[in-house]
């Protein structure tokens, strides 16, 4: 069964209005000139092409974004829920972590309280936690670029930002690797990622077990006025296990971004 997209927007319905007598009047020469002018503008816009090294520029900007994010602490709140056939949650996994980077840029995570686990059919695996850490807030840095094939898919406005749309797929997946397969919406002005939508891969199948992963969407926003950091991840997908379909929903909120220096002491509010 195909996976559902994290966000589904119904197509707008076109409405055909009856033509009035005035509407049937032949256009004036001024109208024709305006139509021609707008046609030329539209043709110019359609002819706009991305730079041939778009992926490299994105990776360069992503490296700068990663370096900037390494100067911030933040809070990461995860909710992963099993849903029944009516969309009601039957079990959940909840956790809150404070994410801290040392002056050597080593990542440290501190659980805030104990995780809440009421899942009945699913369990959280090492791959799930690895994806929460590295794939859902995906950063395609220059040292990651070689892992991916990329293809330009057009342009689109998202979150009021004019974007190039870039598809990325793993060239190959080595044993134990977790990679991203999906679409990136890239700001045309600075090549920063505004939005990403896809899936952590590979899906894991064995004779005795299956480890399947939902499609997700991650939204970024400007945090420091210069770099876009992840602020929200959302997934609502149906996983096709051999013993039956299981709908899941996941949210990850990245909040409380605070820039720190070596001598800084960061204090977080209680959740």
Mark where each language-model region is.
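N-terminal secretory signal peptides that target proteins for export/translocation
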Residues: 1-30
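Mature extracytoplasmic/luminal segments of secretory-pathway proteins
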Residues: 2-4, 37, 160
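Extreme N-terminus of proteins, especially the signal/transit-peptide cleavage junction
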Residues: 24-26, 45-50
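Structured extracytoplasmic
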Residues: 47-181, 188-194, 199-214, 222-225, ...
């Amino acid at each position: 069964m195909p996976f559902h997209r994290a966000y589904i927007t119904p197509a707008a319905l076109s409405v055909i209005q009856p033509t009035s007598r005035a509407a049937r009047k032949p256009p004036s020469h001024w109208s024709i000139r305006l139509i021609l002018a707008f046609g030329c503008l539209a043709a110019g816009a359609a002819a706009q092409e991305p730079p041939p090294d778009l992926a490299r520029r994105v990776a360069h900007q992503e490296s700068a974004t990663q370096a900037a994010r390494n100067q911030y602490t933040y809070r990461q709140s995860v909710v992963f829920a099993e849903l029944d056939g009516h969309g009601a949650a039957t079990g959940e996994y909840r956790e809150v972590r404070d994410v801290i980077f040392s002056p050597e840029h080593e990542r440290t995570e501190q659980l805030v309280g104990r995780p809440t686990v009421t899942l009945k059919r699913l369990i959280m695996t090492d791959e799930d936690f690895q994806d929460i850490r590295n794939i859902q807030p995906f950063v395609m840095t220059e040292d990651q670029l070689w892992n991916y094939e990329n293809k330009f898919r057009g342009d689109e406005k998202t979150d009021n930002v004019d974007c190039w749309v870039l598809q990325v797929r793993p060239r190959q997946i080595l044993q134990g690797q977790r990679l991203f397969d999906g679409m990136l919406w890239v700001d045309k002005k600075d090549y920063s990622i505004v939005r990403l939508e896809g899936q952590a891969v590979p899906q894991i199948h064995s004779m005795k077990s299956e480890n399947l992963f939902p499609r997700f969407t991650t939204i970024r926003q400007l945090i420091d006025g210069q770099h876009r950091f992840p602020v929200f991840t959302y997934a609502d997908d149906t996983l096709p296990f051999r013993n039956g379909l299981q709908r899941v929903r996941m949210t990850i909120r990245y909040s409380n971004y605070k820039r720190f220096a070596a001598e800084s002491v960061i204090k977080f509010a209680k959740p």
